[in-house]
């Protein structure tokens, strides 16, 4: 027996599918984590082809409260110590499995130098991953964020993931996290 759908049913199915494809999961807004107001004004041209994954090399956080504090600490360091207009990353990932909005999808980051900042989204895992791996929940959060970015047109469908060390002289994103992202389907070496 074949199924026949009315035009209204097709519209409903399309809307349901569109919603599922664009679900961005849990992104903690700047307001929710207590961010200072951004002074950044440069827009990021979209869709973006590259994503640079780094680690903060600082303290690990594994609860929403500790990750909110850590996001504030990173922003404080970038703004007050380095003199930047905001936290350098577009997004931060906590070991609580949540994504924390940094500069977001639309604002030029300060994460990978003058060559890569204008053409890449910067995602940084909060913690030091030289000798340990992030928990599965944090890795899933990053993958969901990337899928969301592609579904919503912030990233090109053929976007490429790079490790921070692929584009700059650094140990970031740490040896263990770097091994993991090299297995991701969109990872490409420079």
From Swiss-Prot:
Innate immunity protein that plays several important functions in antimicrobial and antitumor defense systems. Acts as a pattern receptor that binds to murein peptidoglycans (PGN) of Gram-positive bacteria and thus provides bactericidal activity. Forms an equimolar complex with heat shock protein HSPA1A and induces programmed cell death through apoptosis and necroptosis in tumor cell lines by activating the TNFR1 receptor on the target cell membrane. In addition, acts in complex with the Ca(2+)-binding protein S100A4 as a chemoattractant able to induce lymphocyte movement. Gene3D superfamilies: Peptidoglycan recognition protein-like. Keywords: Antibiotic, Antimicrobial, Disulfide bond, Fungicide, Immunity, Innate immunity, Pyrrolidone carboxylic acid, Secreted, Signal. One of its GO terms (molecular function) is zinc ion binding. It holds the Pfam family Amidase_2. Disulfide bonds join 24-148, 40-85, 61-67. It is found in: Secreted; Cytoplasmic granule. The modification Pyrrolidone carboxylic acid is found at residue 22. Residues 46-174 form the N-acetylmuramoyl-L-alanine amidase domain. GO terms for cellular component: extracellular region. Homodimer; disulfide-linked. This is Peptidoglycan recognition protein 1. Residues 1-21 form the signal peptide. One of its GO terms (biological process) is defense response to Gram-positive bacterium. Belongs to the N-acetylmuramoyl-L-alanine amidase 2 family.
């Amino acid at each position: 027996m074949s199924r026949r759908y009315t035009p209204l049913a097709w519209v409903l199915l399309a809307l349901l599918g569109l919603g599922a494809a664009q679900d961005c999961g849990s992104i903690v807004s700047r307001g929710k984590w207590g961010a200072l107001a951004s002074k950044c004004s440069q827009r990021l041209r979209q869709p973006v082809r590259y994503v640079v994954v780094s680690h903060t090399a600082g303290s690990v956080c594994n609860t929403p409260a500790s990750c909110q504090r850590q996001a504030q600490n990173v922003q404080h360091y970038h703004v007050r110590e380095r003199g930047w207009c905001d936290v350098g990353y577009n997004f931060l990932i906590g070991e609580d499995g949540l994504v924390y909005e940094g500069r977001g999808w639309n604002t030029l980051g300060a994460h990978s130098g003058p060559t890569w900042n204008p053409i890449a989204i910067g995602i940084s895992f909060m913690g030091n991953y030289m000798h340990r791996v992030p928990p599965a929940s944090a890795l899933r959060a990053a993958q969901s964020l990337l899928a969301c970015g592609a579904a919503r047109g912030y990233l090109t469908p053929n976007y490429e993931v790079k490790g921070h060390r692929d584009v700059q002289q650094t140990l970031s994103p740490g040896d263990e996290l770097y091994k993991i992202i090299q297995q991701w389907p969109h990872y490409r070496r420079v």
